[in-house]
């Protein structure tokens, strides 16, 4: 198609002339006082190849100049920014948004079909108020939980930084701090994020950024319904003391008929039983990881049947295939009972024998005057039984091999010996 302003082509009346671009907050920049240049029919759109009005501006200090890449018609068809081609509502690539909304917009890619499709869409846009997307995206009214979790609504201004200086990478940059490009090490060329195509992002195919986000979404926790279709009970945890049965009923009644609500105040949880399985599945899907009642986030899970809980008790120590597992050898047994108060007071940290009074030594004293001494041993009858070993509390303490093992030297009884 000829792009000369003087040529009279059949599509000349469809050239775009706009007064302000359609941009996201990140591309626009953080500076509210921005200077922007406008050039009518400055370039052709990279999607529909029609001339359009190009806007160019600098989003901030030490940032690179940015400009619009696609026309406003292509931007309105996909509800994306004219520069970065990210969704204006969620800040996500088109491929992620379409996957979250569960629809695929098959736009024509050949020249003739693309022009015909664009003209029809422009007519539809002119008949609308211009604030809502048209086409397949305008018909998708339902929102997705995945999009709400992955949404990037906070501006990320580092995306506007200059590109890496190729001369600095080769060691030949002589500008120093005056160089408008970044002096940083480039990313790995084998990294998928290093190869991005604007057309692939617009059509939602082979987008490496979208693939990374979709992989992250696949690893998010999910609440799968149990295989037992008779389970219609949901477990709600983390109630606290402020949430009552009425608060739970006011939230869950919208999903279907509620049979019973049992609140266990001691455990701060509740069990909500629905009349039908479908109502329980809808309630679990709409409430998992996003239920907030009275400013408190609650935990929602599926309840378990009594039969399943009984099987778990029976299968204790048994694998799924029915093999009985032996206990692991070498594990320590039960811990001994705690020491008594007297033993704690003694502070016997090294299992030393308790210290007591010195052992009594049987020393023969001279008999008083006027009394005959006893006969020597072996010549007379035994008057007394020989003494046995002294009791434990009378035994002398065992030898201490190292001074550090003596609790008396380690300050265990410092309070007793310290002067008042």
Curated annotation (Swiss-Prot):
Residue ranges, annotated region (Disordered): 303-343, 372-420
Modified residues (Phosphoserine): 4, 102
Basic and acidic residues: bias regions: 309-318
A Gene Ontology BP annotation from the UniProt entry: positive regulation of protein import into nucleus
A GO molecular function held by the record: U6 snRNA binding
Residues the record lists as N-acetylalanine modifications: 2
Record keywords: Acetylation, Cytoplasm, Isopeptide bond, Metal-binding, mRNA processing, mRNA splicing, Nucleus, Phosphoprotein, RNA-binding, Spliceosome, Transport, Ubl conjugation, Zinc, Zinc-finger
Zn-finger segments (C3H1-type): 159-186
Note on domains (UniProt): The C-terminal RRM domain and the zinc finger motif are necessary for RNA-binding.
Protein's UniProt name: Pre-mRNA-splicing factor RBM22
Origin species: Homo sapiens
